[in-house]
Every structure is written in structure tokens, then in C-alpha cells.
Amino acid sequence: MLASKLDPFFKRFEELNSLLSSSDILNDISKMTTLSKEQKNLEPIVLKAKEYLKTLDNIEENKALLNDPELGELAKEELKTLEELKPKLEEEIKILLLPKDPNDERNIFLEIRAGTGGDEASLFVGDLVKAYARYAENRGYKLEIVSSSEGSVGGFKEIIMLVKGTGAYSRLKYEGGTHRVQRVPQTESQGRVHTSAITVAVMPEVDDIEIEINPNDLKVDVMRSSGHGGQSVNTTDSAVRITHIPTGIVVVNQDGKSQHKNKESAMKVLKARLYEMQESERLAKESEARKSQVGSGDRSERIRTYNFPQNRISDHRINLTLYRLDAIMQDGLFDEIIEPLITHHQAQALQEQNL
């Protein structure tokens, strides 16, 4: 019974309240921060659980009044409302009880690269960047370009953006993978539909203490920044290329105005990539459980198709098709896809957890 599973959460919440009011904890900033975070995570469960248990009590009280000559009809109406509320609260609690993704509240690096399709792929990267920018604005996230390489006819061959905002990873993590686009290029005189592809990687921003990098493992090169078409954009060696020798990961940054700024940004991206690599290795060890979840975020996994002639967008992970591609791209309405993905993911997780 669900009610019996809630007792440990009440006990731990009360324990945390007591601990956070003790002088020993108040004098230990690190411990207080850790416990406060745990309390904050538990609070939604405790509040919803209290509402649920109160509903169960009210159901029993109204059942006892059904045969009352004066209050019977009123109790019957109230009971109907409560019986409808009960399963909704149970579902909400079950979702709250699911294991939390530790990265969900983090900022993210969004790395988008042109794949097959040449110039058309680069142009679509540019279109997707604009759509993501509108989505970020809709949700109150801040978006900044960390590094970019422009395409020869527009768009980007590659771009890395930092998306800042509470819960950015929890929603945009579903964007990781290969995105296929089908449309008639502007240069196509015969009106034929071309297919191209781009890849999206979603990497949580990590703290320095989470990823330690041995300076001896790095090869740092400085060079002159180059702009569109390769022309020099300044006369100082401000561009930075960092190679992580053990993994072969290379990060180039030239968008900042100073070498120091570019190196700082490149190091942040490198740490995010190393963290992503560690997470991928960890998840690979849990591959059986992973298979049942919505997408691995692997860049090689084709997750979505954008068909412009049909105004169609299809997410292949949950067989979702919407004929609203124009609105989704123009207004950044990705929640129309992300919300069903979250719902599907939660349903799979509930099944795995036997909740």
C-alpha cells in the first residue's frame, strides 16, 4: 500500500528539521548546505503525502456518514470528489518517488554539429539554434554562445551554447541525438527534397570539484582567431585549442575577446565533455535498464525527423508525429514534444520501480 511507503519520508523530514536547527549544524556551512538541499528535495513529497493521507481520512469520514439522514447526500457528493482525487494524488506521489537524475537542475552545454548534407546541414543548425533560443526565452533560460564555426553559406558547421536556468538539463536532455531534416534547399532548381542530418549533444555544466584534470594531461595551443571564410579577425593569438591527451578530446574556442577568456570557456566545455563520457560509461553498465528509457542521448541515435514539405515533425522514440513544424520552429514550442517524452519516461520508470 502506498501509504505505508511514505512513513520513512516523514521521519527523515522531521529529522532534517531537527538537525538544521541544531547549533552544531549551523556552524558547519558545508553540512548545512547538504542537509538543506536534501530537505528541499523531500519537501514536495512530504507536502503531497500529507494531502494524500488527509484525503484518505476524509474518504473514511464521509463513508461513515453515508447512512446519516441529514448528511448522507452531502457525504455522497463529497465522497465522489475525493475518490476521483485519490488516484491523481497517488500518481503524483509515485512520480515524486522516482529516483532523481542528479543532473536535472544543472545548466547545460548544447553542442550542435552539421552532419551529412553539407551546406544544407549547416543551415539547419542555424535554424535549430534560433528555435532553441526562442525556447530558452519562453522558459526564462539565458543562452550564450561559447564557441561557433560558421557555415560557408550561412548557419553553423558547429556551435556550442551554454543554457542557464533551473531545470535546463531536465528538459533539454531529450534533445541529444541525431536530428534528420528533409526539405528543398534554396539552391535546388528542380524542387527535389534533400535529406541532411545534424547531431546534438547535451552536456551538464559541472563544478571544478566534480571533474579534476591533471594539467600534465593537457596540450594547450594558442593561435590567431579566424572569422567567416577563415579570414583573420584580430592580430593577437587569442584563440585557444586544448587537447586532453588521455581521451583525445579537443576543444577550440575563439569567440572571446581575450586568450584568458577563451581558455576559461574551453576548459568548461572540456570538463562537461569528460563528465558526459564518465556518465555514458556509467550508464552503459546499466544498459538493460537503460534500454527501456526514452533515448540514450547518444549522438548516433536518430531521434527526430523534420519534414518541411509536409510541415511534419516526428519523434521516433515515442512514435509521436505533429503537423506543426512551422509553429514549433518559429516559436520554439519544443515542450509539445518534450512533455510527451517526459510522460513516457516516467511511465517506463514507474514500471521499473514497481510503483
Swiss-Prot record:
InterPro entries referenced in this protein's UniProt entry, alphabetically: PCRF, Pep_chain_release_fac_I, Pep_chain_release_fac_I_sf, Prokaryotic/Mito_RF, RF-1
Gene3D superfamilies: 3.30.160.20, 3.30.70.1660, 6.10.140.1950
Record key words, sorted: Cytoplasm, Methylation, Protein biosynthesis
Compartment(s) where it occurs, according to its Swiss-Prot or TrEMBL record: Cytoplasm
Residue span of region Disordered: 280-303
Alphabetized SMART domains for the sequence: PCRF
GO CC, any one term: cytoplasm
Primary residence: cytoplasm
Comp. bias (Basic and acidic residues): 280-291
Pfam families from the UniProt entry: PCRF (PF03462), RF-1 (PF00472)
One Gene Ontology molecular-function label: translation release factor activity, codon specific
PTM notes: Methylated by PrmC. Methylation increases the termination efficiency of RF1.
UniProt keyword Membrane present: no
N5-methylglutamine: residues bearing it: 231
Database matches in HAMAP family: Rel_fac_1 (MF_00093)
Entry similarity comment: Belongs to the prokaryotic/mitochondrial release factor family.
Known role: Peptide chain release factor 1 directs the termination of translation in response to the peptide chain termination codons UAG and UAA.
The protein, known as: Peptide chain release factor 1
Originating organism: Campylobacter jejuni subsp. jejuni serotype O:2 (strain ATCC 700819 / NCTC 11168)
